[in-house]
């Protein structure tokens, strides 16, 4: 299990009030795609121009290779080519991802790329952006885990580390590390840029600006 190495940052830095979404129970999955190969004996398939939607989650990619069947009961889809996943105001993009389905629900997505990218428009008007070698998105918890060379920014501030976990509902971030990691491997670096001081002009300067 992952162990936290620093507490969730103060609400004034990153957090806002968390709004829990309605539970995704018995919600239909809508699949749009062009079938290329259908192997009914081995329960595998290859699809093109794939779009999957459920409970506000939208997944699209150029291609999907499916193991475990099209019933979404317990299957894994390897999607590739212009991968884009949108959910709860956030978006993930990469060249490749593995999407897991459990009990006819979109359960999780593991996104890999060079690097995998994340973006969310925050409630305070700033945009959170992040990237890492691997990003894991969990639909039930609303968490986005950045693994290996993780970087996250919001406004003019940024956080870096080997592992970061961002909650897209509470819009808060937590640094994480693995048990047994070498000392210093779990450190996070937070850079907070100061606000720019207001520009002060004298009455004489104002007059000079007038024609």
Task: List PLM regions with ranges.
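Mature-chain termini and adjacent capping regions
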Residues: 1-211
């Amino acid at each position: 299990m992952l162990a936290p190495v620093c507490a969730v940052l103060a609400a004034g830095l990153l957090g806002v009030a968390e709004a829990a979404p309605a539970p995704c129970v018995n919600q239909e999955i809508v699949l749009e795609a062009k079938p290329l190969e259908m192997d009914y004996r081995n329960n595998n398939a290859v699809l093109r121009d794939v779009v999957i939607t459920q409970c506000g989650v939208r997944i699209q990619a150029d291609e999907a290779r499916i193991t475990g069947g099209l019933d979404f009961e317990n299957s894994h889809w390897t999607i590739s080519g212009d991968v884009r996943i949108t959910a709860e105001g956030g978006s993930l993009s990469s060249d490749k991802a593995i999407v897991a389905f459990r009990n006819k629900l979109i359960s999780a997505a593991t996104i890999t790329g060079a690097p995998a990218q994340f973006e969310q428009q925050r409630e305070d008007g700033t945009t959170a952006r992040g990237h890492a070698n691997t990003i894991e998105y969990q639909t039930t918890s609303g968490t986005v885990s950045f693994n290996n060379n993780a970087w996250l920014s919001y406004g003019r501030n940024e956080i870096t580390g080997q592992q970061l976990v961002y909650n897209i509902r509470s819009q808060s971030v937590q640094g994480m590390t693995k048990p047994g990691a070498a000392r210093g491997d779990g450190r996070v670096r937070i850079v907070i840029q100061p606000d720019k001081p207001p520009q002060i002009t004298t009455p004489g300067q104002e007059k000079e600006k007038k024609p």
